């Protein structure tokens, strides 16, 4: 008789444990479904957010004013443009020397005139980042490039403009270094860091040279 009672009790307890386990599982499933729904909503929000679309675009900050780095920057820029990518180059600080065409001292203060005197007046005066040897290194590289029929930096700049590469001169750097509009090559745009960031946010790749 006791055996039958124990069996009934054990059976009752077993059913209760099973019911409890089922309840816990249902709660876990409901929580998981809720998290999945929230995740799906977040993904949809990100996909529909303005300015988040990644385009076939390359954005580049050109900070250096060295000849070898300038050549590398324009090789990449023209190569990407030739492949159909939209390319933007943001020239800041010493990179402004690459897009100069002349020097002017008119209307500048003492510090601005000092920068103008010390900095290159264009691609023809750019130094090498290594082994410049007071300008001799740059001349040697130019001769080697000419001997091997390699495109010059001047030709690369023209090619980039022909390919529709967007070139922007940094407003803040121009103001700090006293660079005037008439000192820069034609066909440039002028803007601040927000201009570059707008392009970079939509680009597949961003480079700093």
Where are these regions (language model features)?
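Glycine-rich loop at the start of a catalytic domain that most often binds anionic cofactors/ligands
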Residues: 99-108
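Histidine-anchored nucleotide/phosphate-binding helix
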Residues: 71-89
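Short internal beta-strands
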Residues: 87-93, 168-171
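Long, leucine- and charge-enriched amphipathic alpha-helices
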Residues: 14-55
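A glycine-rich helix N-cap at a beta->alpha junction
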Residues: 107-145, 149
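Short, glycine-rich nucleotide/cofactor-binding loops
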Residues: 60-71, 144-148
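Glycine-rich, aromatic-bearing surface loops/beta-hairpins
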Residues: 169, 174, 182-185, 189-209
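A short aromatic-anchored loop/beta-hairpin motif
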Residues: 154-163, 168
């Amino acid at each position: 008789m006791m055996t039958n009672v124990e069996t009934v009790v054990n059976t009752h307890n077993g059913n209760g444990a099973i019911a409890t386990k089922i309840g816990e599982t249902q709660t876990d499933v409901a929580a998981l479904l809720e998290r999945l729904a929230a995740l799906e909503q977040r993904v949809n929000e990100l996909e529909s957010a303005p300015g988040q679309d990644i385009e076939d675009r390359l954005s580049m900050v050109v900070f250096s004013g060295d000849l070898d780095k300038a050549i590398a920057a324009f090789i990449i820029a023209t190569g990407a443009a030739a492949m159909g990518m939209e390319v933007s180059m943001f020239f800041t600080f010493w990179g402004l020397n690459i897009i100069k065409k002349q020097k002017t001292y008119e209307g500048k203060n003492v510090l601005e005139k000092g920068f103008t005197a010390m900095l290159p007046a264009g691609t023809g005066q750019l130094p090498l980042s290594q082994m410049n040897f007071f300008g001799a290194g740059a001349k040697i590289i130019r001769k080697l490039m000419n001997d091997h029929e390699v495109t010059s930096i001047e030709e690369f700049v023209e090619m980039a403009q022909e390919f529709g590469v967007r070139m922007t001169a940094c407003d803040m750097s121009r103001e700090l270094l006293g660079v005037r509009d008439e000192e820069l090559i034609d066909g440039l745009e002028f803007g601040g860091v927000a201009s570059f960031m707008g392009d970079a946010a939509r680009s597949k790749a961003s480079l700093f040279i």
